[in-house]
Amino acid sequence: MKNNLLLLLPVLPATLAAQGRYNIVYIMTDDHTAQMMSCYDNRYVQTPNLDRIAADGVKFVNSFVANSLSGPSRACMLTGKHSHKNGFTNNEHGVFDGTQQTMPKLLRAAGYQTAIIGKWHLVTTPTGFDYWNIVPGQGDYYNPDFIKMDQSTVREHGYVTDIITDKSIDWMENKRDKSRPFILFIHHKACHRNWLPEMKYLHEYEDVTFPIPETFYDNYAGRPAAKAQEMEIGKDMDLTYDTKIYSPDLKTRLSQNYFNMIGRLDSEDRSRYDHFYDSIAADFRARKLEGRALTEYKYQRYMRDYAKVLKSLDDNVGRTLDYLRDAGLLDSTLVVYTSDQGFYMGEHGWFDKRFMYEESFSTPLVMRLPEGLKARGEIREAVQNIDYAPTFLDLAGAPIPADIQGVSLLPLLRGEHPKKWRNDIYYHYHEYPAEHAVKRHYGIRTERYKLMHFYNDIDVWELYDLQTDPNELHNLYGQPGMEKVTKQLMKRLKQLQIQYEDPILEKYPIK
């Protein structure tokens, strides 16, 4: 509980009590969505190593983010606060204030070693870490650069998912003080756009035709904000950058970005890469596709490359778990796997994230539990990424500052079901105008309903009954018979904005 030390040691097994406290390995990927994780949804791919985490622990089936965008999501995780409180609201202009209170700083003060390896994406230099080794910005899939603690940049040879895992295992084995508990943040670049596969998996999934989502040809009727976006596979997915169709005479908006990325390959890998994708491009040109046929072709290329990137990720999660097992650390370590947000895999015809609609608002969250924490199977309580910070502090026996807005998940990990658990989730997306043209919006989600307000250069409310309309196609706001539900949701939305001290309430007051 907040402002109270959790007395863990009396309930720990003797070996853990002798050591002190649990270690924490926090594995976070980029844009990995629950639809592409077989313990959540096995229609598309198999992820046996990710599923291992859930099989030996828990799977949260109502897991959400506070702001579905990479940098802001990471800031929410580190601080336990919504974007308007931690100050990092968007990627376009956001700069993380590293002087503020963060969960790694608090754990460090409690005696933990803290390390982060991989994607940082918060602009400023990491603070609160005993060790860090990060990729600049989004990082690269092939032969990526890494920034060291002395601010020097080193180009590493290999595939980024392998390298981040190598560095993480090396830190656990060789660079930490093994007499002290630790928290290690393993932040992968995968599965971020533009989904460049590892060489050994170039040919994977090429014989697979992925099913087209039932909302793929959504016409956005009654949802002007959804219609205004610029993230449709058909019209917005870049033919070269995203689907790797290129030729000297083809110039697309992002083609130069693409050539910069593959220009990092050494000559041998570049030859293999070009041989594979040149054949794809030749086949594409021969087809002379247009209209829906072209859109569905781009969708299949997108799905195949995403699945290939994910296969390498799953391999490396397996390597991490195997190391923890072989090093005798599994029973004393909480292993957390999640993503910075969900992602659209063709639902509503989209790729990317940002919206409060389910596919990007929700995010996978599985945990392998150490000895002493007995919960197993599905956890249905609603959780959010602002809850990770208080959870880790609670697990470490460290005080939880009163200004942290999330709540500790530790009771759930013990197998408890608190009667006063939250019944709703608050969301606020801030980045507009920006890439993909998703309007600013905030909203509330309960078990059954979702109410959203799109604002700034638009003033539109949307209301969905998730029980009868899980695909969120039929906006019920203003419809006859919905007055009572709308009034109740408005009242609760206002209460949440007051609770979380969101200044948007002053600009758009709810009566």
Question: Regions from the language model: what does each represent?
Answer:
Residues N4-A14:
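Sec-dependent N-terminal signal peptides
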Residues Q467:
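Residues forming the ATP-binding cleft of Hanks-type serine/threonine protein kinase domains
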